[in-house]
Each structure stands twice: as structure tokens, then as C-alpha cells.
Amino acid sequence: WEKWTDKETKEFQDQFIQWYEQEKRNLPWRYNRDPYRIWISEIMLQQTRVDTVIDYFYRFMEWFPTIEELANAPEEKLLKAWEGLGYYSRARNIQAAAKQIMSEFDGKMPQTPEEISSLKGIGPYTTGAIASIAFGLPEPAVDGNVMRVVSRLFCIEADIAKASSRKIFDEAMRKIIDEKHPGEFNQAMMDLGSAICTPTSPKCETCPIQAFCLANKRGIQTSFPVKTKKAKPKDVYYISAALQNHSGAYYFEERDSQKLLANMWTFPMMEVTQEEYERLLSLIHI
């Protein structure tokens, strides 16, 4: 990106935006530039597939059509609306941010990146998405999909698993983002990374920016992005008991806020060792 001329950058932007306008996905949060809808959709899309999010998004907007109603909603209703999406801390952070907006911003979504990022649960990527899509600010939205696209575009060898690498990708995005259409540009990046510039078997023959892609020219697309492998996840074992009284009612308990399934109502659960778990599995009756 450092070697691109202004003319090359402009050609890239024009081709990319033209492709997006023709091929963009029809998603409910793209119907308008309402910052509330954009915010909720971006939080839901973290760790969750687009197809899964759509129905949840419609229901959430029906139950909590305004920031004020979200801020004042009982937590039980909020968690019910979120049920099935997982990562329930996201829902609690959304409500905490809604209360923050009511108390600090007169009930209106803040418009500057600095103010947006001050809200609970909103990091750099979501800040960039809201600022660019809702308010037309040239703020990059950099996530794993975008880093993959940009790393191939410029053959960036920085390890995307390292937090320090984000600055490099952020700098590259600020260089190439279309300042006249920043929201469309960021969404084009999202769509490209999701549908074409995929982790394995990228569809380079249909890519709208293949002529600009350095990795494509060198035939080394699958060498990027550079990413160190994570440590193998540790297995944790739980047992759960279904307790029923003579009238047929079951016993549930609310989980601790700092543990697995925080604040959710479940059958009684207890963490056990692998040996204890395997021994219990071998029993026919407990």
C-alpha cells in the first residue's frame, strides 16, 4: 500500500465499490444507516454466522426497538432474546452500553470513534463499523476476514495472531479506504472475506480486486495470512443432575456470574476431573 500511487488507489476503490453495489448481500441491518441496528448486528455477528443472526436480529429489534427500551429491559427478557446465540456476556455488555448511552449521551448513539469506543463491549472493529456505516467516517473496521484480505492484497507477513500486528493492518486500511464511501468499503471487505477471499480455496477467479492482489500475482494466496497456531484447548468436564419432585417439577439453579453459562438457569452442575467423569459414564445407574 505504501507503493500505490493515488491513481492506483482510486482505481482500486472504484472497482471495489462498484462490485459491492452489484453483489452486496441483502441483510436486514443494511436497510438503513440506523446506528442502533448496525451496533446490535455487529455484536451479534461476533462468533456467529450471518444466516443464524438474521432471525435473532429481527426478534431483538421487535422486543427492544429503541436504545431506551433496551436499557430499561429486565435482564431475564434480554437473555431470553439472546438465548441460542451463546457468549451471553455480549448481551450484558449491550445493555450496559445502552444504559451508558442514556446517561452520558442523552439517549443518542455517540458519533465520534472516541466516544463510540468508550461504550461497554465495543472494540476497534465495531467502532470502525458503526463510525463508517452509520456516520460516514473513514474509520477502518479490521477483523480476521479483513486482515486475511489485506494480507493477501499486499503480501503482509505480520502474524495476525499477535495483537501488535493490528496496527499494520489498520494503517493499510486507512491508506486504501474510500473516504467518500467508507461504510460501503468496509462492508465490501466483509463480504469479500466471507464469500470469496476465504481461508482455504479462495475463489480468486471471481475476485473483483484480483488484478491488484500481490499474492494472486505471485500464486501464493494460501500462504497468507501468517498465523501462529493457538495452544490446544483444555478439556473441562461437568456432570449435571436432573432433580424432579413428586409433583413433576424440576429443580433449576442460577449459575454464578463468573462461571460457565454465567447467570443462566440450568440443572445443577459440578465440575469434575476426567477420571471422575469417565468413572461416572461407566455406571448404568447413579
Briefly describe each language-model feature range:
Residues 12-13, 22, 234, 260:
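A generic structural signal for short, non-catalytic loop/turn and secondary-structure boundary residues
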Residues 213-214, 257-260, 274:
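Short, catalytically relevant binding-site loops at active-site mouths
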Residues 179, 183, 201, 232-235, ...:
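Alpha-helix initiation and capping sites
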Residues 269-280:
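N-terminal phosphate-binding loop and adjacent alpha-helix
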Residues 284-286:
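Conserved small/polar residues in nucleotide/adenosyl-binding loops
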Residues 222-269:
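N-terminal strand-loop-strand
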Residues 33, 86, 134, 233, ...:
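Structured beta->alpha junctions
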Residues 1-8, 15, 19-203, 209-218, ...:
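Catalytic cores of DNA base-excision repair glycosylases
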